[in-house]
Amino acid sequence: MIELTQEELKQRFNDKIFGQISETADALGLECYVVGGYVRDIFLERPSKDIDVVVVGSGIEMAQALGKHLGKGAHVALFKNFGTAQVKYRGTEVEFVGARKESYQRDSRKPIVEDGTLEDDQNRRDFTINALAVCLNKARFGELVDPFGGINDLKEKVIRTPLDPDITFSDDPLRMMRCIRFATQLGFYIDDNTFESLCRNCERIEIISRERIADELNKIILSPAYFFNTRVSAIRNPASCVPPSMVLMLFTYE
């Protein structure tokens, strides 16, 4: 991992598209942040094409305005049922979504969604390293927002949830598999509390569709650290604290 000053971080966002987003957001009077994996991968010096932008307001309005600002070379796709939009411009794809807060019923992965703040949006993220945000508004361009110590967790190579892991995993059980995936892909260690919660909540994986499980499982098995991560080794062992159903779900999936 590399350490960056705000000025150095700002330079990582010198691509034209970020300047255009900044101008558009300021014109609309909307707060706008790059969030998640793109920010994480800057600090890990990993290539990343997935640019996710959270708007405190309407992500669709922001995308439409940006498309007009960019002109003929821009293609805008709206997904109104999900409150999201995508802008493609000269080989770059940017996903826009309004900041939101979510709550879940125990028997469903479908969240109840409400408009929210950046803080609300970061609270709903799966892991601290994916809750990092960088402001794109001119007055704060390049400012890192890290409420959960995600940068320190990158330094320590730790996977940890921003909130109580029992809440994070119960709300969306697929995050348990994502936890394993990030540990194997990045060669990180799963935080003790997070791992213990994964063990407690693993039966919840049963509400996830087989297709989603298969997708995550493939990513786990293809990860370079799959056979060397001690925490994942524990999960592969049916005699470990993880119930057999989770082991079977992960490693005998057909």
Regions found by a protein language model. Give the residues of each.
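Catalytic cores of the polymerase beta-like nucleotidyltransferase superfamily
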Residues: 1-239, 252-254
